[in-house]
Each structure stands twice: as structure tokens, then as C-alpha cells.
């Protein structure tokens, strides 16, 4: 669904929105890669358990914030208690956004994945991470990001509503999507060769466009 939305945004001349979705696919790629790098057995099972528990962590944290600003102190305390139970259950002192992975931030997760890869694949992950950081700079509400969205040629990535700039989002998205699809096909016991070939052809095509600039 994310990739379909991304393609529609590119088709209609909105590469900035597409780049935002490409970032999401890269984040999914990193999350899957962390699980892939984790050894099989008890440790990995525990990580999966934490990942699913994070649903309630994020829910309680958001409800807690809503209650705080609504002046509902009793409900706020109830959510604090639920979060305390989860901290105790999983023996963690803080429930950061990526606590379940054992890393404090998304950057730490990226570095972990890079450290656990080698050869050409490692080079690809590093390049994707650079593209991700570049996308973040382009989309954040900073002076650079705002100028970029207006189509400032000095920003190097044209994200104004034109025919240009689509390739950056598509390149990052497809390369990230390849890993997501590969793991999904494997877990479902499906043959991945045909889809892998087509996705790699797309990745090569988009990469060739970005390299011409």
C-alpha cells in the first residue's frame, strides 16, 4: 500500500510526499534487518514479544499525554501504572521509541545493521542510509527543507511539483522494498526469484537515473 501511494504521488508530480513515504519504507527495511541480524532462539523470540508489546507502549504513552493536557489526572496515573508494568515485565528503565530492539534510537539501529553486514550489501545499506538522511534534511521544516520544497536549485533535490526529482524517492523506496518483500515471501514459503528479478531491474533503472545527475 505504501509503495502504491508513493507511485501515485510521483505520477501526479509530488516527489516531496513520495520521499516521505520512501523514508517509511527504509525504516521498515531497517526494522526487518534488525530482526534478521538477531540470532534465532530465545533472544529473537523475546525481541518479537517486545515488538508486539510496543503497540500498548505507544498507545499508553499517547493516552497519557492526552489526559495530561485534558486535566484527567486519575486516568493519567492509570496509564503511568500500565507503562510501569511493561517496564518491569521487560526489565527496561525507559520505553523509548525503539526500546524493543535494544537500541535507543533509529540511528543506533541503522549502525547496528551496517555493522552486521558486509561486502556489496553493506555498501548498499550505507548508501540507502545516506539517501534516508538526505530525505530527512529535505523534508524537515528547516530553512533547507523549506527552500527545497519550494524548488530551490541550490538544494540539489528538486521537490517542487514538477516532473523532476521523482527518481530519488523511487530509488530509496524500491531498494528498501526489496528486503521487505524477500522476507515476506520467505516466511510465507513463496518463490521469490521472479519478483526479486523484477524489483532489482527497477532498482538498477532508478539508480542509473540518479547517477546521471
Located regions from the model:
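Residue-level detector of alpha-helical recognition elements and their boundaries
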Residues: 2, 21, 40-41, 150
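Alpha-helical solenoid scaffolds that mediate protein-protein interactions
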Residues: 6, 25, 32-33, 39, ...
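Short, glycine/acidic-rich hinge or "gate" loops at secondary-structure transitions
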Residues: 18, 36-47, 190-198
Amino acid at each position: 500500500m505504501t509503495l502504491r501511494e508513493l507511485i501515485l504521488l510521483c505520477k501526479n508530480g509530488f516527489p516531496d510526499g513520495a520521499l516521505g513515504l520512501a523514508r517509511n519504507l527504509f525504516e521498515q527495511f531497517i526494522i526487518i534487518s534488525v530482526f534478521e541480524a538477531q540470532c534465532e532462539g530465545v533472544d529473537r523470540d523475546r525481541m518479537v514479544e517486545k515488538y508486539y508489546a510496543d503497540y500498548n507502549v505507544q498507545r499508553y504513552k499517547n493516552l497519557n499525554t492526552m489526559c495530561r493536557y485534558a486535566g484527567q489526572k486519575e486516568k493519567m496515573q492509570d496509564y503511568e501504572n500500565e507503562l510501569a508494568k511493561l517496564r518491569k515485565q521487560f526489565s527496561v528503565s525507559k520505553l523509548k521509541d525503539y526500546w524493543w530492539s535494544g537500541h535507543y534510537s533509529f540511528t543506533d539501529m541503522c549502525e547496528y545493521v551496517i555493522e552486521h553486514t558486509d561486502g556489496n550489501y553493506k555498501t548498499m545499506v550505507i548508501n540507502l542510509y545516506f539517501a534516508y538522511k538526505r530525505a530527512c534534511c529535505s523534508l524537515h521544516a528547516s530553512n533547507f527543507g523549506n527552500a527545497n520544497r519550494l524548488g530551490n536549485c541550490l538544494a540539489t533535490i528538486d521537490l517542487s511539483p514538477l516532473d523532476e526529482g521523482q527518481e530519488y524517492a523511487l530509488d530509496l523506496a524500491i531498494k528498501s522494498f526489496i528486503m521487505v518483500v524477500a522476507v515476506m515471501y520467505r516466511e510465507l514459503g513463496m518463490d521469490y526469484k521472479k519478483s526479486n528479478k523484477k524489483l532489482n531491474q527497477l532498482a538498477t533503472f532508478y539508480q542509473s537515473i540518479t547517477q546521471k545527475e
